[in-house]
Structures are given as C-alpha cells and as structure tokens.
C-alpha cells in the first residue's frame, strides 16, 4: 500500500520507535518521531501528521497529559491518537478513551494490531 499519510510516533523507548517506524514505512507511510511529549508539542507547531501513536509512560510529561493537551487545542483536537502502551488494566484503557484516545493498543503488540488500528482511523481498509 502506498500512501501519502504521515504518522507521528511518540515514545521514550528508541527501540519501540524503530519497530513502529519499520512496520509503517513498509506500508508506505511517512513516519516522524518524538521521544517526549514536549518534543511532540513543539513539532506540532510546524507540521501536522495524519495520526499520532502515543506512549503513556514517559518522563517529563506522560502520554495522558499530552493527549489532554492535544484534545484541548482546536488545531490538534481532531487528530486521531492511538495509545500504544504497557498499561493494560481496564481502568487505564477506559481512562485513555475518556481523555479522547481513538484507539488503544497494549504492548507487546503485533504489526497486524498496529496496522489495523491505523486503517480503522484513516479509512484505509484492511492490511
């Protein structure tokens, strides 16, 4: 699948960024990355991705705070956000959705889970 969509991956673990980037670039996406919430928010001043994949457990500013800030600003409130996290408790998932997450994937994850979530949100059909 060739696409001109851009996806931003935000995770403090460079290995996760590399894995996600490899999967998505293989599907034709342009992938940008940030290693923290503040870095993402700064990058969004100059460019808007089509979708954000966001870790929850990060230093400085956790992903839920980042999500809240994204959803509170008109410019970014409609950006689809997938939470990709090791937080697996029902309360964590529910909390993510209540703050405006569009999809929730727990680690460890498969490429199929990731691509299907993106396809669902970007209307790209099946992988």
Kindly give the residue locations of the regions a language model identified.
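C-terminal output helix
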Residues: 109-119
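Receiver (REC) domain active-site loop signature in two-component systems and cognate sites
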Residues: 58
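Charged docking surfaces used in two-component/phosphorelay signaling
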Residues: 18-26
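Short hydrophobic/Thr-rich beta-strand motif most characteristic of the beta2 strand and flanking loop
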Residues: 28-35, 43
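Active-site beta3 strand of CheY-like receiver
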Residues: 47-53
């Amino acid at each position: 699948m060739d696409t001109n969509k851009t996806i931003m991956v935000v995770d403090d673990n460079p290995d996760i960024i590399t894995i996600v980037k490899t999967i998505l670039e293989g599907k034709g996406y342009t992938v940008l990355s940030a290693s923290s919430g503040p870095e993402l928010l700064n990058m969004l001043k100059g460019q808007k991705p089509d979708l954000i994949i966001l870790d929850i457990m990060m230093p400085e500013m956790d992903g839920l705070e980042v999500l809240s800030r994204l959803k509170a600003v008109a410019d970014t409130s409609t950006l689809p956000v997938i939470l990709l996290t090791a937080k697996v408790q029902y309360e964590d998932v529910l909390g993510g959705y209540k703050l405006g997450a569009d999809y929730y994937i727990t680690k460890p994850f498969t490429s199929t889970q990731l691509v299907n979530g993106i396809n669902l949100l970007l209307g790209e059909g099946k992988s």
